């Protein structure tokens, strides 16, 4: 193939990828900002309210990630049907996914409502248990709604329409601020709820986003061919079981990645407030930087799934490669900026020189794993497009929990290889774990792509 033609294909695919990914990036940043707003507004009430919200977040966010990961199975299935031109089959599939969302969202809500035993097992200050549970139970009321919203979002994403989630995410963020104010301080005849009010505001925003997405999907012309609202159907276990076969491994893999950072935070907790603060700064900034390759991975799911639906496995492999290349290009930029501006980044969060020193050191490790993180998250997204999720889950679990965490513990907290290096050793373990995940998932993606090409030949 001539070089000009090849470059033209890359540019065209990159353009299509970014058209999908840009709204996803904005939506993810809006969702992240909601948590930031809750933290800031609760902190202005009292340290106790801030602590209660932080404790509640540490419980409901992992549950949310597990739940939404399971429901992500909707995206590749919709994308493949859309790519195949079989839009009539999309409506029945999504109707079953909505039943699954109702069950998973309701189950998650019940779990959060009864999560007091988790707080007590964590030896949380008894004075914080009641406000933390009030916050959790308020958020739990919104979980069925946000589960249903997420399926509709996956339906829209699978069709290649990612703008609705961006618009609703921005409006949700703008709604969250006044809702927090009303519930926290007790306006319009409501009692002042403090940090618990942040939970009710979050639940309200979840409900609003569901209503907004329902209206969008119901009336926008681009969804009519799918006939989602054409008829009512009772749950069909066979279809739901197929969704679970794809979705449960996705949920477990997402949960495994998120929870390892939580475990490392707990391990660092015994090293002093300065170390914990530095770790939190590095982790918070890394999480924001991660939103872009994560969004590219979500877009890769759609591009790969649609290409496979069209019966073009070579185009699917090409789309996966371009998504990984785009993520690596971004990683070069983000890693360079993090290395050059690590102290300035830490200074945004705190004026404390000791905390800045710790955070700047850990940001170096974050810069190092930008490349492996970019590869693993886009490879995982592309593998979802292939509906290859079970092995992906096993590889992810092994990389993070079988390699990364043990290496981090040995280097950071044990004297097996010399004096323990504290937080640096634990973050070195993250670098090793993410690198192993990147290598294994890239190999798995290459094999899955070759297998689908051979099936066509």
Q: For each predicted feature, which ranges?
A:
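Small-residue-rich hydrophobic transmembrane alpha-helices
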Residues: 50-109, 113, 146-165, 278-342, ...
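Short alpha-helical transmembrane segments in multi-pass integral membrane proteins
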Residues: 1-21, 78-144, 190-248, 304-369, ...
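Generic alpha-helical transmembrane segments of integral inner-membrane proteins
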Residues: 25, 29, 33, 37, ...
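Short runs within selected transmembrane alpha-helices of multi-pass transporters and secretion channels
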Residues: 68-71, 75, 139-157, 165-173, ...
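Helix-terminus/linker motif at the lipid-water interface of multi-pass membrane proteins
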Residues: 29-51, 119-126, 182-193, 251, ...
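Transmembrane helical elements of multi-pass membrane transporters/channels
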Residues: 19-38, 138, 142, 149, ...
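Small-residue hotspots at the loop-to-helix junctions and early N-terminal turns
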Residues: 47-58, 136, 199, 273-288, ...
């Amino acid at each position: 193939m001539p070089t000009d033609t090849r470059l033209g294909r890359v540019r065209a695919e990159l353009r299509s990828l970014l058209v999908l990914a840009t709204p996803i990036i904005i939506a993810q940043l809006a969702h992240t900002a909601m948590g930031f707003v809750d933290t800031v507004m609760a902190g202005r009430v009292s340290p106790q309210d801030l602590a209660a919200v932080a404790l509640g977040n540490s419980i409901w966010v992992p549950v949310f990630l597990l739940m939404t990961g399971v429901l992500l199975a909707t995206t590749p299935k919709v994308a493949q049907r859309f790519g195949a031109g079989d839009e009539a089959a999309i409506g029945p599939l999504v109707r079953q996914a909505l039943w699954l969302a109702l069950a998973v969202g309701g189950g998650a809500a019940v779990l959060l409502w009864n999560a007091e035993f988790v707080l007590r097992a964590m030896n949380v200050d008894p004075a914080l248990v009641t406000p933390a549970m009030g916050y959790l139970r308020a958020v739990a009321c919104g979980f069925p709604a946000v589960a249903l919203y997420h399926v509709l979002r996956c339906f829209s994403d699978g069709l290649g329409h990612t703008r609705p989630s961006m618009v609703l995410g921005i409006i949700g963020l703008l709604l969250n601020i006044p809702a927090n104010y009303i519930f926290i301080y007790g306006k319009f005849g409501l009692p002042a709820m403090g940090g618990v009010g942040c939970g009710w505001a979050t639940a309200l925003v979840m409900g609003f986003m569901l209503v907004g997405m329902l209206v969008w999907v119901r009336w926008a012309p681009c969804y009519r061919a799918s006939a989602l609202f054409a008829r009512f159907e009772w749950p069909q276990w066979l279809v739901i079981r197929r969704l679970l076969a794809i979705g449960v491994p996705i949920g477990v893999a997402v949960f495994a990645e998120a929870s390892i950072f939580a475990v490392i935070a707990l391990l660092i907790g015994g090293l002093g407030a300065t170390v914990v603060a530095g770790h939190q700064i590095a982790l918070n900034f890394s999480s924001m930087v991660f939103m872009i390759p994560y969004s590219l991975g979500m877009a890769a799911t759609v591009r790969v799934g649609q290409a496979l639906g069209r019966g073009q496995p070579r185009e699917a492999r090409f789309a996966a490669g371009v998504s990984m290349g785009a993520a690596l290009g971004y990683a070069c930029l983000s890693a360079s900026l993090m290395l050059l501006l690590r102290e300035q980044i830490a200074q945004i969060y705190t004026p404390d020189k000791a905390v800045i020193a710790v955070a700047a050191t850990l940001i170096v490790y974050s810069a190092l794993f930008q490349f492996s993180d970019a590869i693993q998250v886009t490879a995982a997204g592309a593998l979802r497009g292939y509906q290859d999720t079970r092995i992906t889950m096993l590889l992810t679990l092994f990389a993070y929990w079988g390699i990364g965490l043990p290496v981090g513990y040995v280097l950071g907290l044990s004297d097996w290889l010399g004096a323990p290096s504290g937080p640096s050793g634990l973050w070195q373990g993250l670098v090793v774990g993410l690198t192993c995940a990147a290598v294994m998932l890239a190999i798995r993606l290459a094999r899955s792509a070759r297998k689908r090409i051979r099936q066509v030949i």
